[in-house]
């Protein structure tokens, strides 16, 4: 017995079949993982301080896929995964962007609004003569 196609599962999910939505997610998990890996590497998250792991991106991608279900229209002639791909990718990039924004806010000093610590040269080089 062959597995049902994405378009058929999407139609069932649009009618409220949660099992079909879960199968749709399961059958397309490979694409979600591949996309998560691409974004993880391209965003250089390995060396960042954002604390985002590939699993986080995969979860967001799965949510993106599920959000694509209600708007999919088979009569347009586009395959479901082609339609859902931007939803998946955007959900992942939104996570990265939002995390980066939160990271930037933590870096900003509330008193002077700068993203770095204000330091006087005299504090760094005490007792040194001025070069001016």
Language model regions located:
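Charged, low-cysteine interdomain linkers and short loop/connector segments
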Residues: 96-132
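Alpha-helical promoter-recognition and RNA polymerase-docking modules of transcription initiation factors
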Residues: 1-102
């Amino acid at each position: 017995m062959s597995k049902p196609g994405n378009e058929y599962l999407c139609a069932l999910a649009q009618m409220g079949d949660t099992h079909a939505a879960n199968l749709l997610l399961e059958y397309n998990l490979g694409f979600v993982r591949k996309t998560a890996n691409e974004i993880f590497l391209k965003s250089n998250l390995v060396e960042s301080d954002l604390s985002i792991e590939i699993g986080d991106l995969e979860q967001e991608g799965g949510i993106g896929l599920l959000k694509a279900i209600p708007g999919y229209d088979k009569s347009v002639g586009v395959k479901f995964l082609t339609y859902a791909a931007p939803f998946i990718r955007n959900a992942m990039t939104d996570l990265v962007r939002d995390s980066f924004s939160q990271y930037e806010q933590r870096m900003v000093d509330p008193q002077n609004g700068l993203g770095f610590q204000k330091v006087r040269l005299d504090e760094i080089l005490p007792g040194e003569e001025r070069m001016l």
